[in-house]
Amino acid sequence: MSSSLGKIALLIDGANLYSTSKALGFDIDYKRLLKEFQSRGSLLRAIYYTAVIEDQEYSSIRPLIDWLDYNGYTVVTKATKEFIDASGRRKVRGNMDIELAVDALELAEHVDQIVLFSGDGDFRSLVEALQRRGVRVTVVSTISIQPPLIADELRRQADVFTDLVELKSKVGRDPSERPPPRELRQHMPEFLQRDTSV
């Protein structure tokens, strides 16, 4: 089974995959995700795209980014842009679509299959361009909830659509299995660290 899909690249829209898995009630186990696709073919790249808020002292996504970076993924980040909307509310924007699209087109001549983890309809034209270059495209998102988290035009354009629910047993983890963040353990008040049972 090691070369059934040929040469593969995984392109993960981090924010989109996060919201999809949360809506379905499970976390993604990125170690298992990598192993699953390594077993399906020759995995050339696994790229995770996410925007980060740079001016925060602590970012909740930083431990994940660091782990991915050291465990077989290429991580592409971009600082978010902060602005005030028309009603005076602070908004944060960080879109990684262009970075993902450029990487996909550059990878096209080196892979047989691209697996895109996103439901964003903006990627329909990208999928079509990849197909014109002879690349098969699998899109992973979900139609298992209402409203579906994948744009209909993206699902129709893909060579294969895989509902994330179908991968849950292979790449999912129950949120209750999540270990406490190292930062919380390191910043625990001293009096909570001592054994007071004496």
Regions found by a protein language model. Name each.
Residues 1-198:
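Terminal and domain-boundary accessory regions
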